[in-house]
Amino acid sequence: MEQTLRDGLNDQILSIEVSLIRKFDEQTSDVPDILKLTLGEPDFNTPEHIKQAAIKGIEENFTHYTANAGMPDLLKGVAAFMKTKYHLNYDPASEILTTVGAEEGVAASILTALNPGDKVIVPSPIYTAYVPLIRLARAVPITVDTSDTGMVLTPERLEKAIEESGGDIKAIVLNYPSNPTGVTYLKEELAALAEVIKKHHMLAICDEIYSELTYGDEPHHSMAEFAKENTIVINGLSKSHAMTGWRVGFILASADIIKEIRKTHMYLVSSTSSISQKAALEAVTAGIDDALEMRKEYQKRRDFLYEKLSTLGFEIARPNGAFYIFAKIPAGQIQDSMQFCVDLAKKAHLSVIPGIAFGKEGEGYIRISYAAAMEKLEEAMRRMESYILGK
């Protein structure tokens, strides 16, 4: 067979599949009257005062390159935001970097941190982006099953994974509150993990994009609270301020690490959109508490779905953050998550994401996004009930 130019492309790219989340969402779009609870897209609009700040920036012709790390005022605003919200102290001049969404923050951090052959612990089920990015860096992802420990990584499980992999672990990737499970870590759980991370001189790459969407009495805690020198914190405004399309994220780390990540960021994207940065500055200052009303609504939706799905026989590790339910398919139903979701879409015209999209440890589960109006969720549960009960 004649070789094509494609055959000579980066072998890691050729071996990576398109995100199953996007793939499945597109596949079910053609089903008539389909009701989709598939994507992590807030159904709220960006707050008006943030949009007006961007409009003002356009009118004032703030439409040129900014500094690679971001506008100085924005970096100061992010530093103040993180200190107020999470009691973290970072120097805006040397320890914070503005990125094109948290996704670029994750990619730039991974590509900067890892060498070929480095081993990286990844608790699973896990968001789809991390493992492909680790492989692009030609590092080795080591997934650790958390489905039997409440969807959180315990210090004991982490120690066991380090031992079984032969030690010499370079990094761990943590996402909390979690996509897909909605589960987050308590303060004491993070503190215990931090001790293991420091003991083994590991780097913790922490995606905390859902930090403003936590439910219950305990607020979000960052790994940097317990192991700042070991931690790269990635955050942003997509979920907290309903700004997914604005593409603004942040990386916070020690100055020597930020200095190196900045090189990767510079050659990937140069800088974040100037207008998006104007909007972001408004978000982290005047909009510091914009997430509160959204959080209240998300919590109502979470409680509704949790109760309805539990009644139908789904087992759920109670989600304390983000806007996802990760539910174990009831006994007596199709246990292959892909087959279950395809059948559900065909028969009930309801689209949710198969758990296998989040690693083999997610098999037998489905992910439901409740970033949707309550009326839509109520109809979704009517369809789910009809399907499960065979009506």
Role assignments for model-derived ranges:
Residues 1-16, 27-31, 35, 39-57, ...:
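PLP-dependent class I/II
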